[in-house]
């Protein structure tokens, strides 16, 4: 059961057992749709339809991307939020280039110039694999807290801070109707207690999972050229392979 596999569940008036059961039902329904349609990757619209009137799909995207649930391990299914098809396509490319590794999806939210960090939260979901980067999915799940989703329909978000380690971050963007690929080899780092506490305090009741990306590059250049509010990633360094795949596709 989901509640037994995660580190904790913070029930309140927004996150009830009934709401959580509904989110799990949505996850199982999404798995059925994927199987019925033989999909390789996907994107869920979620906001505002599901978040306002049903339930946020944070459980679905976290588990599908992570490749682990109550039935055990399965092939990770790259899936993005907010109907971001190009984000999902980027995730699929990173999965294939990395040999099948789980991929993640996040918002480019905040730049910490002093700390040389870029904050990468998500509106409520984070691929479960990155909660621990362990081959044992059960151990990763123990690093996740289910906290209230501050959305009209309530439900849970998968709160975690992704583990430190090498990352390849990428994004397919359209510029003047043509694709461009942005690729960064970097790493996630463990934030100091002060940085994490400040982030949590700033979020108030609206808590989100967040990765902290080391910005050992020209931050201003990144801000000027990066052409999206979303970014995708995979564990390891695959800049060369990603570049070669884009070149072979003619972009």
Regions found by a protein language model. Name each.
Residues 2-251:
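Anaerobic metallocofactor- and corrinoid-dependent redox/one-carbon enzyme cores
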